[in-house]
UniProtKB/Swiss-Prot annotation:
Residue span of region Disordered: 466-493, 510-547, 573-647
Keywords: Phosphoprotein, Protein transport, Transport
One cellular-component annotation, GO: FHF complex
Residue positions where Phosphoserine is found in the record: 467, 510, 523, 529, 533, 859, 898
GO biological process terms on file: early endosome to late endosome transport; endosome organization; endosome to lysosome transport; lysosome organization; protein localization to perinuclear region of cytoplasm; protein transport
Name recorded for this polypeptide: FHF complex subunit HOOK-interacting protein 1B
InterPro entries: FHIP, FHIP_C, FHIP_KELAA_motif
Protein's job: Component of the FTS/Hook/FHIP complex (FHF complex). The FHF complex may function to promote vesicle trafficking and/or fusion via the homotypic vesicular protein sorting complex (the HOPS complex). FHF complex promotes the distribution of AP-4 complex to the perinuclear area of the cell.
Binding partners and assembly: Component of the FTS/Hook/FHIP complex (FHF complex), composed of AKTIP/FTS, FHIP1B, and one or more members of the Hook family of proteins HOOK1, HOOK2, and HOOK3. The FHF complex associates with the homotypic vesicular sorting complex (the HOPS complex).
TM spans (from-to): none
Pfam families (alphabetical): DUF5917, KELAA, RAI16-like
Family in the record: Belongs to the FHIP family.
Length: 973
């Protein structure tokens, strides 16, 4: 049905049923058929007298003859376009068409006119006139002309002549594409006629010819309406080829269509801006309004969307060939090196481009080859995915773009992606104590986990009715930006451009519109429950105290997010519950060794075995035979058994089976000691940190600290985060490890006070997105607060407890913390209100240069505040909420009482850079104190949503009972 709708849409875009330029069809429709036939024969008799001469060279008045033939031909074709079939015999040709077919009129006239090409004068003009006449005849004819062989023969002669070396011109190109487009529209109505245009080989051993197709290919990457019209016509041919094996084989075996598309993508990518310079520190992804304003990027996206559509409708041979060419001709030689440029700005640009491509692709086969490139292609011994994971720990801008990319990857609900990132490290269950393995599948029906998360809210962040009332500065919007931008810049309050995350805690997982997958869970904002509901606007006055009453909104959003993930994962190959897939793999084969990504395996780094690893089934279908005890895969799990490191971990107890029992006793004593420490920690956390001393963070082994340090290194020089080994050099293979992705996320979470507000929005959104997944291994790892992990494995609860302690320590050292916290909440609420009071089109669209220098900043609704070009009315609304005043204490911003002022309010110690750095540190910490409690509410709500959803997860009896939710689930072709 979608395909038919698509074809009808393309047909409606064609220039059919219109009067072509230069052709005024003022036909005397009142004339009877006999009169029209008599006039038609009279014109033809005069043309025949000219055609029967010796040729244009011998004729004294050759130019006059050419003009006369042109005029008579125009009159005849005008009459022929109005000819109708006889009512008594509707299938027979009309009288004029029957006469033209009998006389072979079109071919004789065209052959005579082509003789003039030998003179070399006016060839371009004559060719354009011929194309226009035939286009008029095809588009305006009242009868199916293409059913008749003489008409098709004349068209093929004209198309063959268009391949001769003739000086090209816009008029000639436009006429050719217009005629070809009309022919494709006519063939779409009668697909059986397509093979009649496939000419046999002119000589033995030569390839057949499909001029209708080959004349369109050179225009496939052309800019403007001409290129779009050529692509539409080619898409019609691709759809027709799906039902014609002959035409499909011709396109795949005897044309350069697929190489032209792939190499065209490479050439167009090389013209993209290598640096994306944006003034705001909240930018993190390219939106449609961004790339539409950049001609080079708009042309690339048009070609990429065309490739996506071709793979959707073309013959299977063409689909497979195009996918292979895109992988081997664009992704590997172009995108791979682009993602590993030494310049941080170029890394940011290439990562943003990749995220845009993944978000724009809808065809599973094309998306599969992009994911195969990310998961399996190696660059300098490491996969692309490992490199991207490591960059989460880099500077703020590169970190934000990388987080945005992983948000898009998780939105695909692809089993292969989640398996590579997290699940393959959790499947052996080495991260939990042996006695805790059965608890992986436990469901928290009594809300203990939710209670534990809520107990981590720092006391200093809880609402108190007697909050100090102080004059407020508008300095939150004028303070220094993220460390990744110039800290001396002054930013004013702007209006967000997309729906907010329910007015404050704004983290929109989907990117809006049709270019993103189905929205992932969005948490409600720091606003009162009814007022911040998406169905209504907030009240004019909202105080920070109301932010304590929004938990019901979190529950609604969490339920929607969990339900979406459950639906998207229903057909995964295994439930990942600690038993399926089994942690112990079957005997290792050659394909198993290839699948392992551990660096100590010493495999070939060229990545040449990707095709063999994937097999004919693509990313999801290959190398399943090594897991013989598993049922046949139904979806898209990465084929092959688990990593070699996991097998080594599982073999450790077997190798030590003959050791004395006292070792086991010592291990049990260590387990009891760790359990006692955990219980003490739980008691302290349940009291909300009210004791005289905050709970101490459990110390980590040296190996784990080194693992975290490897992902949080300085972004300059960029070398340290270009690769992400799965284990550090000093880490033993048997050491429990939850993978670099979770390690770098936890390390970034632990540094929430140092992150910018935009990084924290993206970061907490990604963790919440992971927590919504229904797999028991992942759910228990993130949300089960009673699970006892190995001493070397840090849990999310520990990370959050550490952040809580840091916030409380900061609040104790900051005398005016309550006022600063209230100021931060009011500012974010004001930013959320601007989104409701101002529509997305409230201001003129900004002009953008090719370098994206003036690209708009992301909005709060995109997880961040995208507002660089907000209208004046929105800025004034924000300034009314944040009425500036004089603050005698140490403040957060650098602004004074007027929008343009920049009066420092920090104690005058050190120089301006020191004051700005201190202001930025305080600003980030207080923003963290606003975000952190809301993140805890979100996690608590997600854990409760799992409790009412988990009993129905991956129920085989329900498989196939309904279509999956929107978004990308299975990768199987």
């Amino acid at each position: 049905m979608e395909r038919m709708n698509w074809l009808s849409r393309l047909a409606s875009r064609g220039p059919g049923h219109r009067v072509p330029q230069g052709a005024s069809l003022q036909t005397p429709v009142m004339a009877d058929p006999e009169t029209c036939l008599m006039v038609f024969k009279n014109h033809w008799s005069q043309v025949v007298r000219i055609l029967e001469r010796q040729g244009p060279r011998a004729a004294p008045g050759g130019a006059d003859d050419l003009s006369a033939v042109r005029n008579h031909t125009y009159q005849m074709l005008t009459l022929l376009a109005e000819d109708r079939a006889v009512p008594l015999v509707p299938t027979a040709p009309g009288p004029l068409l029957e006469f033209a077919l009998r006389e072979d009129l079109l071919t004789r006239v065209l052959t005579w006119q082509l003789q003039w090409d030998e003179l070399g004068d006016g060839v371009e003009e004559r060719r354009a006139e011929q194309l226009k006449l035939f286009e008029m005849l095809v588009s305006e004819a009242r009868q199916p002309l293409l059913r008749h062989g003489p008409v098709r023969e004349a068209l093929l002669i004209l198309l063959d002549a268009c391949g001769r070396p003739v000086p090209s011109s816009p008029a000639l190109d436009e006429g050719l594409v217009l005629l070809l487009s009309q022919l494709c529209v006519c063939l779409a109505r009668e697909p059986s006629l397509l093979e009649f245009f496939l000419q046999p080989p002119p000589e033995p051993g030569a390839a057949p010819r499909l001029l209708l197709f080959s004349r369109l290919v050179p225009f496939v990457h052309r800019e403007g309406t001409l290129g779009q019209q050529a692509r539409d016509a080619l898409l019609l041919l691709m759809a027709l080829s799906a039902g014609s094996p002959t035409v499909g084989c011709y396109i795949a075996d005897h044309s350069y269509f697929c190489p032209v598309l792939a190499t065209g993508l490479s050439a167009l990518y090389s013209s993209l801006p290598r640096k994306i310079e944006v003034p705001g520190d909240d930018w993190h992804c390219l939106r449609r309004e961004d790339w539409l304003g950049v001609p080079a990027l708009a042309l690339f996206m048009s070609s990429l969307e065309f490739c996506n559509a071709v793979i959707q409708v073309a013959h299977p041979l063409v689909q497979k060939q195009l996918v292979d060419y895109i992988h081997n001709g664009f992704l590997v030689p172009v995108m791979g090196p682009a993602l590993h440029k030494t310049s941080v700005e170029e890394m940011i640009a290439s990562t943003a481009y990749l995220e845009l491509f993944l978000r724009s692709i809808s065809e599973p086969a094309l998306l599969r080859t992009f994911l195969r490139f990310l998961l399996l292609h190696r660059h300098d011994t490491h996969t692309i995915l490992d490199t991207l994971v490591a960059r989460i720990g880099s500077n703020s801008r590169l970190c934000m773009v990388s987080l945005s990319l992983f948000r898009t990857l998780l939105n695909l609900s692809c089993e292969d992606v989640l398996l590579q990132l997290v699940l393959r490290y959790l499947v052996p269950c080495n991260h939990v104590m042996l006695s805790q393995k059965p608890a992986v599948r436990d469901v928290d029906l009594y809300g203990r986990a939710a209670d534990k998360f809520l107990s981590l809210i720092p006391r200093c962040c809880r609402h108190h009715a007697s909050s100090p009332s102080r004059p407020e500065h508008a300095s939150w919007a004028r303070g220094p930006g993220s460390p990744s931008v110039d800290s001396s810049s002054v930013v004013t309050v702007h209006r967000p451009s997309t729906p907010s995350r329910l007015a404050l805690f704004l983290r929109q997982q989907s990117l809006g519109g049709s270019e993103s997958p189905a929205p992932a869970p969005r948490s409600p904002g720091l606003a009162t429950s009814p007022a911040s509901s998406p169905g209504r606007r907030p009240s004019p006055v909202e105080e920070p105290g109301e932010l304590e009453d929004n938990y019901l909104e979190y529950l609604r959003e969490a339920r929607r997010g969990v339900d979406r993930c459950v639906q998207a994962c229903r057909t995964w190959s295994a439930p990942y519950d600690g038993e399926r897939p089994p942690p112990e793999p079957s005997p290792v084969g050659s394909r198993t060794k290839k699948r392992s990504l551990l660096p100590e395996e010493g495999r070939d780094n060229a990545g040449g075995g990707e095709e063999e690893e994937l097999g004919s089934g693509g990313l999801a279908g290959g190398a399943r035979e090594s897991l013989g005890h598993l049922p046949p895969p139904q979806l898209n799990g990465l084929p092959g058994p688990w990593p070699e490191g996991a097998k080594k971990v599982r073999r450790v107890p077997k190798e030590g089976a003959g050791e004395p029992l006292e070792d086991t006793s010592e291990g049990m004593a260590g387990l009891e000691g760790f359990g006692q420490e955990l219980r003490e920690l739980e008691v302290a956390l349940s009291n909300g940190g009210a004791g005289s001393e905050p709970p101490l963070e459990p110390s980590l082994p040296l190996e784990e600290e080194e693992a975290y340090e490897s992902f949080t290194c300085s972004p300059e020089p960029p070398g340290p985060f270009l690769s992400s080994p799965l284990r550090t050099l000093n880490q033993l293979p048997s050491q429990p490890f939850t993978g670099p992705f979770m390690a770098v996320l936890f390390a970034k979470l632990e540094n929430m006070l140092q992150n910018s507000v935009y990084v924290n929005f993206l970061l907490t959104g990604l963790v919440a997105q992971l927590a919504c997944h229904p797999q028991p291994l992942l759910r228990s790892f993130l949300l089960n607060t009673n699970m006892v992990f190995q001493p070397s494995v840090k849990s999310l609860l520990q990370v959050l407890g550490s952040v809580k302690n840091k916030i409380e320590s900061f609040a104790a050292s900051q005398e005016d913390f309550p006022a600063l916290l209230s100021k931060a909440k009011k500012y974010l609420i004001a930013r959320g209100k601007l989104d409701w009071t101002e529509g997305p089109a409230a201001g003129p669209a900004p002009r953008r240069s090719d370098s994206l220098v003036k690209s708009r900043r992301p909005s709060l609704g995109e997880l961040l505040l995208r507002h660089a070009h907000s209208p004046t009315r929105a800025r004034q609304a924000a300034q009314m909420v944040l009425q500036p005043g004089r603050d005698g204490g140490a403040g957060l911003g650098l602004g004074g009482g007027s929008p343009g002022a920049s009066t420092p309010v920090l104690p005058a110690r050190g120089g301006a850079p020191e004051r700005q750095g201190e202001a930025l540190r305080v600003k980030n910490a207080v923003y963290c104190a606003v975000i952190f409690p809301e993140f805890l509410k979100e996690l608590a709500a997600i854990s409760q949503a799992h409790a009412v959803t988990s009993p129905f997860l991956l129920d085989t009896s329900e498989e196939g009972s309904g279509p999956p939710v929107s978004g990308f689930g299975p990768l199987n072709p």
